Amino acid sequence: MANDYPSSDEEIMEAQTGSRKRRKTSSDSESDTAPRAPTATSISRVKPAKDRAGHQAASRVAVSKASVPEENGKEKVSFASIDVAPWLVASLASMEIKRPTGIQKACIPEILKGRDCIGGSRTGTGKTVAFSVPILQKWAEDPSGIFGLIITPTRELAIQIYEQVKAISAPQSMKPILVTGGSDQREQAIALASRPHVVIATPGRLAEHIKTSGEDTICGLRRVRFVVFDEADRLLAPGRGSMIPDIETCLSVLPPKEQRQTLLFTATVTPEVLALKSQPRAPGRLPIFVCEVDTETLATPASLSQLYLQTPVTHKECYLHVLLLTPLNLTKSVIIFCNRTKTATLLEYMLRMLDHRVTALHSGLKQQDRISNLARFRAQAARILVATDVAARGLDIPEVGLVVNFDVPRDPDDYIHRVGRTARAGRPGNSVTFIGQRDVELVLAIEERVGGKMSEFEEEGVSVEGRVVRDALKIVTEKKREALLNIEEGRDVKGNRMVGMKKRRVVE
């Protein structure tokens, strides 16, 4: 099928949030169901977060945390000390990965012992290495295909995992393949039939192969030794746009769970994920290993500075232009998150007209454009990436200095995933959330979830409002109008008319 499931950013968010209570959107989301503004005529500061301990105790299933080996000045834990094979230790060292993170120290030894695993850790802590290393080590001891299947919700995540597995396994003749939407299905069927060692797939496209490609293509899946669900909370979320039907199709051709190891990794350990722990085990099977490292107490990175900026809905683009040009942010790599594809498209067009080096990533783009745009941003050919929540999870984009929430996310967990794109691996980072009068309830829910309070963005000695009026109001309004016209006329971001493209109307 041409597109992976779900096909739109709204459906992607539905799949991620599942049956959790929806929060109403801001007025910029073009919805009549926006939350009612507070009675106060203005907000000078966001209210402090409430004590969340009672709420968390009531809403989450209690899980005993795995004990993680501690490092001290005398003895530091290494990959060799947790039984990783020498060739893998050398391969990781060549990638400048020399010491295991908390999730890696806890999970790798247990997976090597043959245990199923549920691993939870915040973004940027090396979960991909935590499941890739034991799979590669076991494969090297008994090479066969298809040895491992890794299922992940988005194409970009699948590509990233594919590249990382390929890099780690470089010293060996390992053959991984990608099975995602947006690529030729016939070529993928041939690759699957050739018995690759590891398959990295999105659930929609793999399910399509299982239904249509024939037994010769999928028979290798019947002997899989490892199955990994990356971003498991999103894969298993119920509700509209759920990926569960496709996952059930994938599981239908795999060996019984007693004959394979199942690994689930996520930054957000949801009740749907934890429910798998209580499933009955076959006699003689080791208990499921459950490890949560920093999923609650450090949901956002310690080196992250979380800021907010009050913006009138009618002039948000002006404030964004000014924010990007402040001396503090002028050289930073920036990701701007929007709730809607239309908003992301408009911002990309407008910012390009304002001479920013910008690209975009969202479900409205063709697969090849998504790949090339992400590559441009990673190579710093583009300084700014305008994205929807397609880019919020798992993508390892180094050196992102600033995350801007142009729209307040509807769900607090989406906020955690967004701001987790910066301040990775202990590096400092900033996030700025644009807040309108109707967004206060959403922000308070975010503060309660992360257990902290946002600070107001300030530029020393400068009035942001003054800069907007003086430097941005006229030019940004003009360029926004031009951008809307180009989109309506079916022109691309460079202003060229797209062949065969019908006119599109974008509602402001």
Curated annotation (Swiss-Prot):
Name the SUPFAM superfamilies on file.
P-loop containing nucleoside triphosphate hydrolases (SSF52540)
Region Disordered, residue ranges: 1-68
Q: Which GO terms describe its cellular component?
A: nucleolus; nucleus
Residues given in the record as ATP binding sites? S121, R122, T123, G124, T125, G126, K127, T128
Which residues does the UniProt record annotate as the domain Helicase C-terminal? 323-465
Q: Where is this motif: DEAD box?
A: 230-233
From the UniProt annotation, give the residues forming the signal peptide. none
Annotated InterPro entries: DEAD/DEAH_box_helicase_dom, DEAD_box_RNA_helicase, Helicase_ATP-bd, Helicase_C-like, P-loop_NTPase, RNA-helicase_DEAD-box_CS, RNA_helicase_DEAD_Q_motif
EC number(s) reported in the record: 3.6.4.13
**One Gene Ontology term from the biological process aspect of the record:** rRNA processing
Keyword list (alphabetical) reads:
ATP-binding, Helicase, Hydrolase, Nucleotide-binding, Nucleus, Ribosome biogenesis, RNA-binding, rRNA processing
- Asked if the keyword Cytoplasm belongs to this entry, the reply reads no
Q: What is its main location?
A: nucleus
Q: Where is the composition biased (Low complexity)?
A: 57-67
**Domain writeup:** The Q motif is unique to and characteristic of the DEAD box family of RNA helicases and controls ATP binding and hydrolysis.
Its family remark reads: Belongs to the DEAD box helicase family. DDX49/DBP8 subfamily.
What this protein is reported to do is described as:
ATP-binding RNA helicase involved in 40S ribosomal subunit biogenesis and is required for the normal formation of 18S rRNAs through pre-rRNA processing at A0, A1 and A2 sites. Required for vegetative growth.
Query: What is the name of this protein?
Result: ATP-dependent RNA helicase DBP8
- Organism the protein comes from: Phaeosphaeria nodorum (strain SN15 / ATCC MYA-4574 / FGSC 10173) (Glume blotch fungus)
Q: What is the lineage of its organism?
A: Eukaryota, Fungi, Dikarya, Ascomycota, Pezizomycotina
